[in-house]
Structure formats: structure tokens, C-alpha cells
A protein has these predicted regions:
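Active-site- or DNA-interface-adjacent structural scaffold in DNA-acting proteins
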Residues: 99-167
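Charged, often Cys/His-bearing segments associated with DNA-binding zinc-finger transcription factors
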Residues: 1-44
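Secondary-structure capping and boundary motifs in well-ordered enzyme cores
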Residues: 35, 56-64, 79, 103-106, ...
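DNA-recognition alpha helix
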Residues: 82-96
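Alpha-helical support elements that line or immediately flank enzyme active sites
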Residues: 64-77
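Peripheral, non-cofactor segments flanking catalytic/redox cores
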Residues: 42-45, 69-70, 94-112
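Short, Lys/Arg-enriched N-terminal segment that forms or immediately precedes the first helix
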Residues: 43-57
């Protein structure tokens, strides 16, 4: 049986000494496709009118913002808090989003603010561009999209139930 080590852990560790893995194959392939097509430059060009060149605090880069939204989409995260947490937690996602090991993940409020800053048409244009590149790169088949929208009646409060036959 092993025993707990009592030695003091090192205070500084070089990033080259940190254990690394090849990363998530999907994000590696996705990143390669987006990089080859110039995604970050395209996103910056599309979003240029929403960013002031000299005013305010530094904002989230458009390429990084849309990469975060892609992570949220592919992992089923519908809240900015979940996207920010995932970016802070996963090294593969950090690599895809272009976050260095020493950089903090964007705060959920920054993601939310950026979402409100950029209009719907620009979001649609960028996601359409990404979708076309992913179909061409073989990550999406591009044949059909299924949407499930089921409407269900719900009883909000059991005390307010009224029988239909007696009114």
C-alpha cells in the first residue's frame, strides 16, 4: 500500500514540464479546418463595425468569441456560464479557443456582453460560413437537419386543476 507523500510540491513548474495529451480529435480537426480557411480574420472583418478601436476595456476577440459559441453548440451548453466553465476546465477546449495556459478563461459576463453587441445577421453569416467549411472539410454531412419542437400541456399547480368534463 502506498503512503501519502509529505514533501512540498514545487512552487513553479515550466509549461514544457506539464503533462500533455494529443487533445480532442474533433477539436483538433475543427481547428485545422478553421485555421486553413482563415476563420479568425473572417470573423474580425465581419465584426469590425461592432468594435471601437480606442474606447473601453479590451474586448473578447471575435474569433475567440465564435469559437466559444461553437464549443457551446457542440457540447450542448446553452448558458454562457457553462461555456466559460468548460473553457476554463478543458485543455483541449483551451487549445481550440486559443487560450494560453497562463490566460484566464473569459468571464461569462464578457461572453454575454459580446453576444448582445453583435447583431443576429452577423452571427448567421459567420455560422453559415463555418457550416460550409465544415461540410467541405468532411466534419458535417450536410444532407438534412432535424428539429424537434413538441408542445406539451403542463399543470402549473395541482390545486388549480379543473376537470374538463365538469368545468
Amino acid at each position: 500500500m502506498g503512503t501519502r507523500k509529505t514533501e512540498q510540491p514545487p512552487l513553479w513548474v515550466a509549461t514544457a514540464d506539464l503533462p500533455s495529451s494529443p487533445g480532442h480529435p474533433f477539436y483538433s480537426k475543427l481547428s485545422a479546418i478553421l485555421d486553413a480557411e482563415g476563420f479568425d480574420r473572417f470573423a474580425e472583418d465581419q465584426c469590425r463595425r461592432f468594435y471601437a478601436p480606442t474606447m473601453g476595456r479590451p474586448s473578447l476577440e471575435p474569433g475567440r468569441y465564435f469559437r466559444l459559441l461553437l464549443v457551446g453548440y457542440f457540447e450542448g451548453l446553452d448558458a454562457e456560464r457553462g461555456i466559460a466553465w468548460r473553457a476554463a476546465d478543458s485543455l483541449a477546449v483551451r487549445r481550440f479557443v486559443r487560450l494560453g495556459i497562463e490566460e484566464a478563461a473569459p468571464d461569462h459576463s464578457t461572453i454575454s456582453r459580446t453576444r448582445r453587441l453583435i447583431d443576429v445577421d452577423t452571427h448567421r453569416a459567420i455560422f453559415t460560413w463555418v457550416q460550409q467549411r465544415l461540410v467541405a472539410g468532411g466534419l458535417l454531412k450536410g444532407r438534412t437537419i432535424a428539429i424537434d419542437a413538441t408542445t406539451l400541456e403542463a399543470n402549473a399547480a395541482m390545486r388549480s386543476i379543473v376537470r374538463r368534463d365538469t368545468g
